[in-house]
């Protein structure tokens, strides 16, 4: 029997408001433990919450960008459970009347477009953070308690780990473009829970659902799903049954492990939050927010293709991140070869960002600096290969490219007489390759060019090198 997977995702995104959802405490990441707190977010007796209007606005922005219906009337609810990181012993969330519902995003997998439904988006407060650094017990940091979140719940419309990965990538891109969240998984501002089950191909009944946690990257989501789908199919093929539970992804072992049996919604004893009035979103306010939405990724991609002549692949990669798209456009306005800019962004820039774990706005290289580097290549001051060395130094130090070229003596050798002397020496030292070239072996030319580059430490002008080599070899 063949099986297929059914996947749904729950994404929690911290909102980029300056203050928390029900009080005036800062939402800044990285403060000393328990310094961004007050009686309200600590849930002390006698305190009352006041809903931050910006939270509603940002949630509506996200909802509109994700093609949702925005509720004119919604309310907050108490979700009751006890855990040390939850100071009130309940979380203020939304239950039966979410702010946004019935949305969708379109993803592209294997050249085909698929629509993934979004069941709901609701607002809620974040919990604190448990720190297990001490063997004698755990510590709680309440700085995060009360930070505003939106929870985006997809329909179970995904059937492969690749679809889940593409959905998350698209969702992150839209949240960044709307400036609703910075989506930094390493800081916990984007968190993903995955629900997955398997069923016989062609069946309409859903299988037993497993929730996966501890997923700290989109690739981890993909790997965890790949493993979990295989595990569930194996259990069923061996005549076993799937137990509804929450499982943890163990990155080191590459497996999922049981955490706890899955709670149902009624375990939380939801009831309306008595200390907050209902949320009213008027049509006028909704329209005002809609008009403030920026250019979305798919529109920007189309524009980059038509306006800058980028290939579709380049435009898709560049526009997947708002920060990279903005960087590209600043370069393209100052430099007349947009394709060269995209090559650098997708090549050396991307490689070094991946190696260092930095985002483009955390790197000391500005668009103006990259343009200067490209112009140094165009003007024959440095070669393309030397430019990579210069760029690495720029990336690490923030120095201007011309300063690095001067300091390290990297200027290209473009003096014909100087280069001819070096080439004559290379020819004299490699008679076998010279003979091979004269006998029609084109590869020998590549070897000789390489020897010239080696002798000049990569500083020989490539075009001039080829020209002089051919002249000398024809003598």
Curated annotation (Swiss-Prot):
Gene Ontology terms for molecular function: asparaginyl-tRNA synthase (glutamine-hydrolyzing) activity; ATP binding; glutaminyl-tRNA synthase (glutamine-hydrolyzing) activity
Keyword ATP-binding attributed: yes
Keyword terms of this UniProt record: ATP-binding, Ligase, Nucleotide-binding, Protein biosynthesis
Entry superkingdom: Bacteria
Pfam families cross-referenced by the UniProt entry: GatB_N (PF02934), GatB_Yqey (PF02637)
GO biological process: glutaminyl-tRNAGln biosynthesis via transamidation; translation
Top EC group: ligase
Xref: InterPro entries: Asn/Gln-tRNA_amidoTrfase_suB/E, Asn/Gln-tRNA_Trfase_suB/E_cat, Asn/Gln_amidotransferase, Asn/Gln_tRNA_amidoTrase-B-like, GatB, GatB_C_1, GatB_Yqey_C_2, Gln-tRNA_amidoTrfase_suB_CS
E.C. code: 6.3.5.-
The reaction(s) this protein catalyses: L-glutamyl-tRNA(Gln) + L-glutamine + ATP + H2O = L-glutaminyl-tRNA(Gln) + L-glutamate + ADP + phosphate + H(+); L-aspartyl-tRNA(Asn) + L-glutamine + ATP + H2O = L-asparaginyl-tRNA(Asn) + L-glutamate + ADP + phosphate + 2 H(+)
Family membership: Belongs to the GatB/GatE family. GatB subfamily.
Role noted for this protein: Allows the formation of correctly charged Asn-tRNA(Asn) or Gln-tRNA(Gln) through the transamidation of misacylated Asp-tRNA(Asn) or Glu-tRNA(Gln) in organisms which lack either or both of asparaginyl-tRNA or glutaminyl-tRNA synthetases. The reaction takes place in the presence of glutamine and ATP through an activated phospho-Asp-tRNA(Asn) or phospho-Glu-tRNA(Gln).
Subunit structure: Heterotrimer of A, B and C subunits.
Name of the protein described by the UniProt record: Aspartyl/glutamyl-tRNA(Asn/Gln) amidotransferase subunit B
Organism, as annotated: Thermoanaerobacter sp. (strain X514)
